[in-house]
Curated annotation (Swiss-Prot):
Belongs to the universal ribosomal protein uL13 family. The keyword Ribosomal protein applies. Pfam families: Ribosomal_L13. The gene is rplM. Gene3D superfamilies: Ribosomal protein L13 (3.90.1180.10). It comes from the Bacteria. This is Large ribosomal subunit protein uL13. Part of the 50S ribosomal subunit. GO terms for biological process: negative regulation of translation; translation.
């Protein structure tokens, strides 16, 4: 018996909508990352992008446990001396609520070209409205 290897052209990708309202950030991010990689499919192949498209709505209503809302800090660096910037979860969720879920999921995907291709299939929206109704996404309950 030979090992099955998925062909990139033969992969069937579905569209799913995930409602993040009231969900814990890490728990929803792990399930989204797993779906983007395609690990829920029988034809999963590590070196082929077999994942589905995921639309996340209500990103502004995602929650974190404990006192991570004030204590969780996101860092970035401008590559210039003294260019370290930081922002707390509370401020980031007020300014760019989509970025919280995007950063959590991006950290769970592989680095490199394959991971970037998987990340491009993630669509995050702060509110209820999204512009992907033409793809007829299915509701994914996490």
């Amino acid at each position: 018996m030979k090992t099955f290897v998925a062909k990139p052209a033969a992969v069937k990708r579905d569209w799913y909508v995930v409602d993040a309202e009231g969900k814990t950030l890490g728990r929803i991010a792990t399930e989204i990352a797993s779906r983007l990689r395609g690990k829920h499919k029988a034809e999963y192949t590590p070196h082929v992008d077999t994942g589905d498209y995921i639309i996340v709505i209500n990103a502004e209503k995602v929650r974190v446990t404990g006192n991570k809302a004030a204590g969780k800090i996101y860092y970035r660096h401008s590559e210039f001396p003294g260019g370290l910037k930081s922002i707390s979860f509370e401020k980031l969720i007020d300014r760019k609520p989509e970025m919280v879920i995007e950063l959590a999921v991006k950290g769970m995907l592989p680095r490199g070209p394959l991971g970037r291709a998987m990340y491009r299939k993630l669509k995050v929206y702060a509110g209820v409205e999204h512009n992907h109704s033409a793809q007829q996404p299915q509701v994914l309950d996490i």
